[in-house]
Amino acid sequence: MGTDGMAGRAILIAGPTASGKSALALALARARGGVVINADSMQVYADLRVLTARPNPAEEAQAPHRLYGSVDGAVNFSVGHYLAAVGEVLREVWAAGGLPIVVGGTGLYFKALLEGLSEIPPVPEAVRTALRAEAEGRETAALHADLARRDPEGAARLGAHDRLRVLRALEVLAATGRPLSAFQGSRRPGPLAGMPCDKLFLVPDRALLRARIDARFLAMMEEGALDEVARLRARRLDPMLPVMRAHGVPGLIAFLDGALTREEAVARGQADTRAYAKRQVTWFRHQAGAGWRWLAPEAAMREAGG
C-alpha cells in the first residue's frame, strides 16, 4: 500500500457491508494524507446518514471525504452519474498531489472505475414516467416476460424478479427502439483503467459479520434511523427510487404505516442486510476481475499501521 509517485495511483477498498471498510480507509487517509472517496450507492444520498452507516462528522473531520451525502433522495443516481462525479474528484485529488482512497461496497461502481461503462443513451423523463405508470400494479415476472418477447438476450441476463433492471431495459427499448445489449459493446473508459491501484477486498469471518450486521442495525435504531426514515417517508418519493429501497427503509416505513411491529421491522432490516452482504461477496468473487487481494479486516488494519 505504498504512496510513492501518487499521480494516477489509488487505493481501492471493497467488501461486504459492516466489514470495517470505512475504518480502514480512514486509518490509511490519516497515515498517508489520503482523500476518502465514496463508492457506496446508498451513502451518496443526503437523506440517509445513519441508516447507510455514512462516516459521522467526527470521522469526516479527521480526513477529507468526498461524494458522501451529496445527492438528494429524489434523484435516481446511476452508475453513469457516479462515474462522471468520481472522475472529476479523482482528477482534483491527483492535481493536488493527494492519494485517492476509494471505499465502498457497490461492485458496479468499482467495475465502472476500472473497466468503463457502456454508452447507453439517456431515457427521456416522459418515457420513464409513462412506462413506470404502465408497470404499476404489474408483477415483475410479467414485466420480465414482456422483455423476453422483445429482447430475449437481455431478458436472459436478468433475474425474473429484478424489477429495477427489468424496467431499465424496457425503458431503453421504449426510448430507442433498440435492446440494451445493442449498446453494451460501446464503452466509456473508466478513470482508473490501466492505473496502478492497490485493490483490497475485506473478508471477515462469516459468523462475526452476521453478528456485526445485527448489532449495527440495533445501534442505528438508537442513533436515529427511525426519525431519518420518517423524514424520508414524509417526502412521498417514488417507492422505486434507490433511496426508498435502501436496506432498512421498506421495513421501517411498514412499521410507521402500522403494517409491521417495531421488532418485525428491525428483524427485516437485519435479514435484508445479511442477505445483501452475502450477495456482495458472491458478486466480487465472480465479477470483480483480477488483482484484488482478499484480506481479513484485522490483517488489512495491521498492514495499514492502524
Curated annotation (Swiss-Prot):
PANTHER family: TRNA DIMETHYLALLYLTRANSFERASE
Residues holding ATP: G15, P16, T17, A18, S19, G20, K21, S22
Residues annotated for substrate binding in this entry: T17, A18, S19, G20, K21, S22
Cofactor(s) the protein needs: Mg(2+)
Top EC class, one word: transferase
Any GO BP annotation: tRNA modification
Record site feature (Interaction with substrate tRNA), residues: T106, R128
Keyword Disulfide bond: no
Gene3D superfamilies (UniProt xref): 1.10.20.140, P-loop containing nucleotide triphosphate hydrolases (3.40.50.300)
HAMAP family: IPP_trans
Family affiliation: Belongs to the IPP transferase family.
Superkingdom to which the source organism belongs: Bacteria
Assembly and binders: Monomer.
Protein species of origin: Methylobacterium sp. (strain 4-46)
Annotated stretches, region: Interaction with substrate tRNA: 40-43
Swiss-Prot/TrEMBL catalytic activity: adenosine(37) in tRNA + dimethylallyl diphosphate = N(6)-dimethylallyladenosine(37) in tRNA + diphosphate
UniProt EC number: 2.5.1.75
Name this protein carries in UniProt: tRNA dimethylallyltransferase
Keywords: ATP-binding, Magnesium, Nucleotide-binding, Transferase, tRNA processing
